[in-house]
């Protein structure tokens, strides 16, 4: 059980867990100075909510076979479809060893100015979390990705531009031997073109890289 009490004077909330957390979690702000300048470092851990009311998931064999559900959007030409994914939960998704079988995959469409992936949770995946391939102007915003195999937020061909990747949290990316060679040293965010917007994203727990600029 989690309870939250807000102090009437300071307006600061106090969060209480029953039972208590099993491990110690430090949260604070550290300050460092060299005598002339002072810098601060945020040491608060990120928290992401995985549960949603609408759930899309693989079946009971997905985890053992690394063969989960997937969503692929493909259509011929600019603005030829609209894909709007908002506040849904995707679990046991993606298929290892199968090219193009990612949890959420926008594939060779061109401009998709009315499409977005927003507020979703994508976790326990077997082949990335989201993939942008040959698309422009897609918004990926305020999502949580956890325990994904391979580069998690993935821009594929270095031809994708004007996409907005904003406010996402990626935690515990895992190495994969079923994808590219670079997926053995994975990144939370795999970035292949400078003409995309990355802002206010956070990552933690990757065995190698947070943001990999492959340009």
Regions found by a protein language model. Name each.
Residues 2-215:
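Beta-strand/loop edge motif enriched in small/polar residues
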